[in-house]
């Protein structure tokens, strides 16, 4: 490790990581309601001299993009983390909004996915700023909204035109894992339509719920045409995640004497690199069309994204992500990991179960930004579990590795970050 890196790492303080993550825990930021935490972060960065863009991704909904400006000529690096958090589960044994430190475990709702990672990327920039080291390239800290809705904040950021030469997304996949592969996700609504009428006269009625039972059964038999990925053996896979039936598109549920004329299921499909949404729809229709052809009363419709009336729905498709492990940004993080820990990363590439998810790297890569996933994990694998926590030691390690990465990347020329095949 060189003296410059050692100087910067001397400004990484685990206590400050705990304090910042704790402050973020105290601000609830469920999807679509990230603005309070965005304003908090904007104030945090402004007080420390960063260039701050409080970006409005839709009316009244904000996300914070902070930049530590370089001196010029160097490659730019984005560290990306989302401010939205998962739904609150019911069996917490602690107050989910009061941070609790027990040994190496910091508890609090949202710290796992992913306010612990947010604290790490922010304190990465702070370690560099406070050391007095000036990077040649810009270091962008993107605190984005709406990742759990398909990456709405990062998508909006790309639509705004911002680009960096490389990026790291600090999802909670482990401080010893460099993840370069994930599945794709598409959410859809499938509707069946019937004809309503009173229970006293069922002639001429069609029960949309009954028709949906046949649709669900057919969906269980969908066979996706794809090239298998041995590293993602469970996918592609379809799940019917919710069902609602009633009268009209408001799904009136309080008139059970009447036949329901609308039924909707919400379907999730996780798919592998090489598949497209068009492929998936064709495979689903190939299962459902014969059903409709054999039943004149069965009418179905597929809607992507699900209707706006389903609050918090996933509005964007997240395509599969497959970054070459020899990409310069991947190798830069690997070098930094070795320099900081004196060891080899436990894994580079596909890491299960983490690669079975999807995340904001899909939008960054689609915009041409080489990237990977590297962030602090927890003792458990499910970000929605009760009593969620993050390991402070993981936050500390990630911060140190990313600080070393920024020193490496931002002193290079932008061309040095291009994929070998693009040179």
At which residue positions do the language-model features occur?
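Metal-dependent amide/peptide-bond hydrolase catalytic core
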Residues: 1-2, 186-423
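Acidic/His- and Gly-rich active-site-bordering loop/insert found
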Residues: 2-107, 130-135
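A short linear hydrophobic-aromatic micro-motif
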Residues: 50-54, 177, 349-350, 371-372
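Short acidic loop-to-helix transition motifs that present clustered carboxylates
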Residues: 58-62, 174-175, 356-358
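Hydrophobic/aromatic beta-strand patches that form the interior of the parallel beta-sheet core
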Residues: 77-79, 142, 166-168, 241, ...
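Acidic-glycine-rich active-site phosphate/pyrophosphate-binding loop
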Residues: 86-102, 181-191, 335, 339
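A short, acidic/glycine-rich surface segment
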Residues: 86-88, 151-153, 175-178, 224-227, ...
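Fold-level recognition of mixed alpha/beta catalytic cores in primary-metabolism enzymes, strongest
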Residues: 106, 112, 116-221, 230, ...
């Amino acid at each position: 490790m060189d003296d410059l890196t050692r100087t910067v790492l001397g400004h990484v303080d685990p206590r400050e990581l705990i304090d910042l993550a704790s402050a973020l825990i105290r601000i609830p930021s469920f999807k679509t309601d990230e603005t309070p935490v965005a304003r908090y972060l904007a104030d945090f960065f402004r007080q420390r001299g960063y260039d701050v863009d409080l970006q409005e991704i839709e009316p009244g909904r904000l996300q914070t993009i902070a930049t530590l400006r370089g001196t010029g000529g160097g490659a730019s690096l984005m560290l990306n983390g989302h401010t939205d958090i998962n739904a609150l589960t019911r069996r917490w044994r602690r107050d989910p909004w009061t941070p609790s430190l027990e040994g190496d475990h910091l508890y609090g709702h949202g710290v796992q996915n992913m306010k612990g990672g947010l604290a790490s990327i922010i304190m990465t920039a702070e370690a560099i700023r406070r050391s007095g080291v000036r990077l040649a390239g810009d270091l962008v800290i993107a605190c984005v909204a709406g990742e759990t809705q398909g990456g709405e904040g990062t998508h909006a950021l790309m639509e705004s035109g911002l680009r960096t030469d490389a990026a790291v997304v600090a999802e909670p996949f482990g401080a010893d894992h460099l993840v370069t592969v994930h599945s794709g996700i598409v959410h859809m609504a499938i509707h069946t339509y019937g004809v309503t009428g009173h229970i006293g006269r069922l002639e001429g009625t069609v029960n949309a719920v009954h028709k949906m039972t046949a649709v669900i059964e057919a969906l269980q038999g969908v066979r996706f045409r794809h090239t298998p990925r041995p590293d993602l053996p469970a996918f592609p896979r379809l799940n019917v995640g919710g069902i609602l039936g009633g009268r009209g598109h408001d799904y009136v549920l309080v008139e059970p004497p009447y036949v329901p004329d609308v039924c909707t299921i919400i379907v999730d499909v996780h798919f592998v690199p090489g598949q497209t949404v068009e492929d998936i729809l064709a495979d689903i229709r190939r299962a459902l069309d014969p059903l409709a052809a054999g039943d004149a009363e069965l009418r179905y419709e597929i809607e992507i994204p699900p209707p706006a009336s389903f609050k918090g729905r996933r509005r964007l498709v997240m395509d599969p992500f497959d970054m070459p492990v020899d990409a310069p940004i991947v190798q830069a993080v690997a070098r930094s990991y070795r320099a900081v820990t004196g060891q080899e990363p436990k894994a580079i590439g596909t890491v299960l179960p983490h690669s079975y998810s999807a995340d904001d790297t899909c939008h960054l890569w689609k915009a041409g930004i080489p990237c990977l996933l590297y962030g602090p994990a927890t003792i458990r694998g499910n970000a929605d579990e009760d009593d969620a926590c993050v390991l402070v030691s993981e936050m500390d390690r990630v911060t140190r590795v990313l600080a070393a990465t920024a020193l490496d990347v931002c002193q290079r020329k932008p061309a040095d970050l291009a994929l070998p095949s693009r040179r």
